[in-house]
Amino acid sequence: MTQQITLIKDKILSDNYFTLHNITYDLTRKDGEVIRHKREVYDRGNGATILLYNTKKKTVVLIRQFRVATWVNGNESGQLIESCAGLLDNDEPEVCIRKEAIEETGYEVGEVRKLFELYMSPGGVTELIHFFIAEYSDNQRANAGGGVEDEDIEVLELPFSQALEMIKTGEIRDGKTVLLLNYLQTSHLMD
């Protein structure tokens, strides 16, 4: 028997920037027993991320920016090194990531390769992230990057080996970035 889910109630607790739901549902277990659950679910929309890499220079482009959630959770500076990313905002994932790449890193990417889609925190967050990689070259630099309006983003071009080491030292602690760097390493694209 497959599990059956019945929505009992969906109460919106907050919808200031993203939406926080309080969901009550019945879950029929495989053994037939019905269990009532009540959970908070944070709907922040879906997103996309991209890792830019250069096989000739053996470099990657990452960004550093303030992330309030990490600061609240003990990251003293709140600064996080991560891959370029953004919310889809009704765009297709590839359209979104091309816009984000030029806004955040300053690079106008050519061919992009979609790797996979992953839920990053499925216990309470709805977000599905689309993961991409793209090779970049210096002549694709259209502007300085740094984000738009209220963003304060530092663009980092790092040796690939240094970025991998930064995972070990804890300087890179962002899940999507670790996944993309590890993908690049295991795919041997930088060998």
UniProtKB/Swiss-Prot annotation:
Gene Ontology CC annotations of this record: cytosol
Annotated InterPro entries: NDP_pyrophosphatase, NUDIX_hydrolase-like_dom_sf, NUDIX_hydrolase_dom
Enzyme Commission identifier(s): 3.6.1.-
Domain spans labelled Nudix hydrolase: 43-180
Cofactor: Mg(2+)
Its biological purpose: Nucleoside diphosphate sugar hydrolase that hydrolyzes GDP-mannose as its preferred substrate, yielding GMP and mannose-1-phosphate. Can also hydrolyze the pyrophosphate bond of other sugar nucleotides such as IDP-ribose, GDP-glucose, and to a lesser extent, ADP-ribose, ADP-glucose and UDP-glucose. Shows no activity toward Nudix substrates FAD, CDP-ethanolamine, CDP-choline, NAD(+), diadenosine pentaphosphate, GTP, UTP, ATP, or CTP.
Classification of source organism: Bacteria, Pseudomonadati, Pseudomonadota, Gammaproteobacteria, Enterobacterales
Keyword terms: Hydrolase, Magnesium, Metal-binding
Disruption outcome: Cells lacking this gene show no defect in their capacity of forming biofilms.
Position of the signal peptide: none
Pfam families reported in the protein's UniProt record: NUDIX
pH dependence: Optimum pH is about 8.5.
Catalytic activity, reaction form: GDP-alpha-D-mannose + H2O = alpha-D-mannose 1-phosphate + GMP + 2 H(+); GDP-alpha-D-glucose + H2O = alpha-D-glucose 1-phosphate + GMP + 2 H(+)
Keyword Magnesium: yes
Catalytic class of the enzyme: hydrolase
Gene behind this protein: nudK
CDD domains: NUDIX_GDPMK
Binding-site residues, Mg(2+) 1: 85, 104
Protein name: GDP-mannose pyrophosphatase
Impact noted for substituting residue 149 to A: Does not affect catalytic activity rate and substrate affinity
GO MF annotations in UniProt: GDP-mannose hydrolase activity; magnesium ion binding; protein homodimerization activity
Effect of residue 152 to A: Decreases catalytic activity rate by a factor of 2
Residues annotated for GDP-alpha-D-mannose binding in this entry: 17, 38-40, 67, 85-87, 104, 127, 150-151, 176
Consequence of substituting residue 176 to A: Decreases catalytic activity rate by a factor of 820 and substrate affinity by at least 2-fold
Motif (Nudix box): 79-106
Domain statement: In the dimer, the N-terminal domains are swapped between the two monomers, such that residues of both chains contribute to the active site.
Assembly and binders: Homodimer.
